[in-house]
Amino acid sequence: MIKGLYEAHLPVSDLDRSIDFYSGLGLKLDHTFEDRLAFLWIEKDKSWLGLWKSDRVELEYHPSIRHIAFQVSLEGLKNSVSWLKNKGYKPREAFGFEPIEPFVMPHDNYAHAKIHFNDPDGNSLEFICKIDNPNKITNRMYLSEWEEINK
C-alpha cells in the first residue's frame, strides 16, 4: 500500500529566501501559490517539500514538527561539511557531536551516518545515509572512527 513519503511541510518567514536556500541544497522549485506556499522537488515525481510562509515560524523547536532528513550517498555525506560551508550553510552540533564531520548512530545490523544543520528559520535539517553495521557496534562515534573500526 504505502510506497514512500511524498511530501513534508515546513514554516518559513521569507518564502523567497527559503526557496533560494533549498534550491542551493539541490531541490528544484516546481511552483508557488499566492506568494505564501512553494513546492520544491526533492526527487522529481517522487517526493517534494512544501514551504509555507507564516508569521509564526518561531514555534518552539521539537524534532517531531520541524525536522527533515534528506537521504544522501555515503560519498556525498563524507563531503557534506565542506559542501555546506562552501554554500554558506553552517553544520551544527547534534547528539553531543561537534559538526567537524558526520557521525554515526548505530542500531542492530545497520547504522545511520549523519550531519545536522538548520535552514534560515531554524528548521532542523540533516543529511543521512544508512550504512551496514557488520560488527554490531553500539557506540556513537564520528564517521572516520567508524570506518577505521570497520576496515
Predicted regions and their residues:
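Core segments of cupin and vicinal oxygen chelate
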Residues: 9-49
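Vicinal oxygen chelate
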Residues: 13-16, 69-124, 132-136, 143-151
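Short hydrophobic beta-strand motif reused across regulatory alpha/beta modules
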Residues: 28, 125-128
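Short beta-strand/turn micro-motifs at beta-sheet edges
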Residues: 52-58
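Short clusters of small/polar residues that mark proteolytic maturation junctions
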Residues: 34, 53, 128-129
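Short, solvent-exposed beta-strand edge segments and adjacent coil->beta transition regions
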Residues: 3-7, 63-67, 112
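Short glycine-biased active-site loop of nucleotidyltransferases that positions the nucleotide triphosphate
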Residues: 39-42, 58-60, 106-107
